[in-house]
Structures are given as C-alpha cells and as structure tokens.
C-alpha cells in the first residue's frame, strides 16, 4: 500500500531556516540538570501522545496524523495520511513488530522501520523515536547530545539522524518537561513532528478508538 503524495504544510517550509544553530555552551549547572532529567524521563514509560507529522522524502511530502500509546501492555503507533489517504498501525509484539493497514494487510518483522518503509515508502525511525520523542537518546548506540541551559536536549545526533528540539511543554505536577516540536533529518529525509497532547498513561485502548480497524 503505497500512499499518494499530498500537499505540504506551509509552516513546514519555513522550518529549514529555523533549525540552524551554533554550538551550545555546557556549564556545570546545565550538565547537572541534564543528568537529573534522564531518570524521570526513562521512568516515564507509560504515555499517550497525539500530534502531527510532516514527512519529506526526496520530492515527496506526506502530512500524517500521529497517535501513539506506549504502555507496559500495549505499544501501538497509528499514522493516518491526510485527506483520508490511508492509515497504518504498528504494534510491538515482544521482540517483533506487526504492521496493519486499514484495508486488512498484516505483516510482521523484527524492524518497525523496515516494515513501514516496505509497506508505505515512509522512512520514519520508529524504534529510536520511542526515546527521542521524550527527549532522550536511545540506548544501545552512540549518541552526541547538545543540551540547553535548562538541561534539556537541544540537538541529538544518533543512528545517522540529527534531531533538533525546537520547543518543550512546560512541566507540571504530573509530567516532566516534554518535547512539543521536533525537526529531524537524515540524508534526503526530513521529518517535522508537532505533539499536540501528552498524557501520563493510556486511558483507553485502540480497540475503542478505532473499532473497525484491524488489530
């Protein structure tokens, strides 16, 4: 199921110039704040986010809706193309991943990124994004973080990706400060992510959200 190209968001076109940044000085204070932030973010492993993705691959642009439930019993990522052009869901099943489409196609593999690319042509690093979207380096591979004065990730280089953290939500009593806008690039692929809502834990399952969508 290869989905057709849709028109780009005008806002995303202005983002290229907004992502240029110089090196960020690291002070003892900011480094200490960064060290303090990492444990609460790792412990924040039950969450539900909703947002939007603008995906640029060569000359093609896709605008996608994003809904991601990450809980101890369920890890389900749903991407829906604009204008009703299609929907896919990726669910983690132990050490493997299952991809389902709205028209009933189901595939399994040990790589979510490869599954998504094979079925849709989209190049989205799902496995790393599970950590990057919270403002953390993914474990198990070298990373080069740059942090801001508040001890938050400003730029992260990992697995060939450059991840720019453009904005954070303000922390409250229930949640730590979490990314709100990210810009990512690797080769000819550019991804803009806007997170509209964070929740501390899933409140309902996808079976209730999309009752007609195959599991």
Please report, for each region that a protein language model flagged, where it lies by residue:
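A short, Trp-centered hydrophobic/proline-enriched beta-strand micro-motif
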Residues: 37-59
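Bacterial Sec signal peptide processing site at the extreme N-terminus
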Residues: 13-36
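Envelope-exposed proteins and targeting segments
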Residues: 45, 64, 73, 86, ...
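Gly/Pro-enriched, hydrophobic low-complexity segments
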Residues: 135-215
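Solvent-exposed helix/loop surface patches that form functional interfaces
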Residues: 114-150
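N-terminal, post-signal-peptide region of Sec/Tat-exported proteins
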Residues: 58-80
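An acidic-aromatic
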Residues: 74-123
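Sec-dependent bacterial lipoprotein signal peptides
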Residues: 1-19
């Amino acid at each position: 199921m290869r989905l057709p190209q849709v028109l780009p968001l005008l806002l995303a076109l202005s983002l290229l110039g907004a992502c240029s940044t110089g090196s960020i000085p690291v002070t003892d204070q900011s480094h200490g704040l960064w060290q303090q932030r990492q444990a609460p973010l790792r412990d924040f492993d039950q969450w539900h986010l909703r947002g939007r993705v603008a995906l640029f691959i060569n000359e093609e642009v896709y605008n996608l809706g994003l809904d991601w439930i990450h809980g101890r019993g369920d890890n389900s990522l749903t991407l829906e193309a604009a204008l009703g052009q299609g929907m896919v869901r990726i669910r983690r099943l132990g050490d493997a991943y299952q991809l389902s489409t709205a028209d009933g196609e189901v595939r399994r593999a040990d790589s979510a990124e490869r599954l998504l690319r094979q079925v849709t042509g989209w190049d989205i690093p799902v496995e790393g994004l599970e950590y990057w979207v919270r403002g953390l380096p993914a474990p198990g591979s070298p990373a080069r973080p740059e942090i801001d004065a508040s001890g938050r990730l400003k730029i992260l280089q990992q697995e060939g990706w450059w991840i720019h953290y453009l904005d954070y939500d303000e922390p409250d009593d229930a949640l730590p400060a979490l990314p709100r806008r990210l810009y990512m690039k690797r080769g000819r692929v550019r991804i803009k992510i806007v997170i509209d809502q964070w929740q501390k834990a899933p409140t309902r399952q996808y079976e209730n959200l999309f009752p007609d969508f195959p599991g």
